[in-house]
Regions:
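Anionic, Ser/Thr-rich low-complexity intrinsically disordered regions
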Residues: 2-57, 61, 67, 101-130, ...
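Short linear, low-complexity motifs centered on an aromatic residue
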Residues: 87-105
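Generic recognition of long tandem-repeat/solenoid scaffolds
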Residues: 75-77, 101-103, 195-197
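A eukaryote-biased signal for long
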Residues: 125-270
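Classical N-terminal secretory signal peptides
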Residues: 1-15, 20, 250, 257-270
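Amphipathic, interaction-prone secondary-structure segments
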Residues: 44-45, 49-88, 175-192
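Short, isolated positions in well-ordered beta-strands
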Residues: 23, 30, 83-85, 208
Length: 270
């Protein structure tokens, strides 16, 4: 049976309205490694399948092992402006020109993907860890500087969670040399909503990196505070046990801050 003949379950949709914001989460199956169209896509195909669209729009010689091409988290203001997180836009922020991390297993990793048709089309250096500095795709919202920060200590106070979801975008075990993954989580409480988009990278014996984009909007507000941070450290300098640096939700607190950006998203007419 060809991939185009496989019947996948329909995507799962969740939607929650919180004040002037609507939060939508879409979760679907992992993208296949071959064309999913009944008749193979070509350059003239106006609406190609996910894989062929990725090949058209990305310049990466390979893709992560697990790509959730249809998954999405979108937060939309009633005016129509939105910020969204999806796999394609996250991968567009991966460095496609140079290998930013040199490790002993890099060549073996590339050789393991030598049979990939996509890899044969474009052979060049690139960031094989798929590290991304993606901060979300903003459409119809105004981005401005902000001195207001997200109170993480306040968010630790127990509160009823009225809506929650977790959406994976991509993941790869780097040929058993570590882990790279992109996931976005959102939770809504009576006091506001909080979302975290996280890229976690671990290259065994080399480095741990966590790039976070946090979003917070208090109840009744027509704006979102967006904080983006990058943290990383060589594993040799992390005086913590492996179970911690292998846990993205724990290790980020042990990593030194490399860079940080804070801004505010709001409707363009405000």
């Amino acid at each position: 049976m060809s991939l185009s003949e496989i019947v996948f379950p329909p995507p799962k949709y969740q939607e929650y309205v919180f004040g002037c914001w609507t939060i939508k989460a879409v979760k679907s199956h992992i993208m296949g490694s071959s064309c999913e169209a009944p008749t193979k896509c070509d350059d003239s195909t106006e609406q190609p399948c996910n894989l062929c669209r990725y090949e058209r729009e990305l310049r990466l010689p390979s893709l992560p092992d697990m790509v959730f091409a249809s998954n999405l988290l979108q937060i939309t203001h009633r005016s129509g402006g939105s910020i969204s997180f999806n796999c394609l836009d996250a991968l567009k922020c991966v460095n496609d020109r140079e290998d930013t991390i040199q490790v002993a297993h890099a060549e073996a990793w590339k050789e393991a993907r030598a049979d990939c048709e996509y890899a044969k089309k474009v052979v060049k250096p690139y960031d094989w860890t798929f590290s991304t500095n993606f901060r979300g795709t903003v459409d119809g919202l105004k981005v401005s500087d902000s001195t207001e920060r997200i109170d993480l200590q306040k968010l630790k106070i127990p509160e009823e969670i009225v809506f929650y979801d977790e959406v994976f975008l991509y993941e790869d075990e780097l040929d058993d040399n570590g882990s790279t993954r992109c996931v976005v989580k959102v939770r809504v409480m009576p006091s506001g909503f909080f979302a975290v988009f996280r890229h976690y990278l671990r290259v065994d014996h080399v480095i741990v990196r966590v790039n976070d984009t946090r979003l917070y909007s208090p109840s009744g507000a027509s704006y979102i505070i967006r904080e983006t941070s990058s943290r990383e450290a060589p594993i040799s300098k992390l005086n913590i046990p492996p179970p911690i640096y292998k846990n993205p939700d724990q290790v980020w607190q042990h990593l030194p801050l490399v860079s940080e950006t804070v801004d505010k998203l709001s409707p363009e007419d405000l």
